[in-house]
Amino acid sequence: MRSEEPKTHVRPSWDEYFMQIAEMVGTRATCDRGRSGCVATRDKRILSTGYVGSPSGVKSCDEEGHEFHVVIHDDGSKTQHCIRTTHAEQNVIAQAARASASLEGATLYVHMTPCYACAKMIINAGIVRVVANKDYHAGARSKEIFKEAGVLFDLMNSELETYPGQAVEEGV
């Protein structure tokens, strides 16, 4: 017998579903400045996951502390980045390679717009679409190269991702 009550459950879209999984994957990250996760999919199936973390067998930020690198931007502003870890996008590609899983034609779900180095790896891995939950302060070049290479880029939320200590004060 059918119920006549209206349904209140709203089923997430595939993009929302895989983004929620990417956010959960990010809870495994080992750097508190970028607890990001990433999921690679094709045909609505997960191929690989990755999160921000130190290389296997190497101490993490959570254990050892951050390894900072200061970046001076074209406008003269400075930001600091932790370079102890491997990005979630790099790890999703590495994990797929270790499992002999091709990412050709895949969609990537990421916490924020990938950095320029990750964008180039994404293109070379054959990934055809990137879906980011938030924007990245230095993501403009990534978006440009995605467009040039024919990689579709979708931003789910226009919010800019920030983290504590991102801007460097003068004299530091």
Q: Predicted regions span which residues?
A:
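Zinc-dependent deaminase catalytic domain
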Residues: 1-172
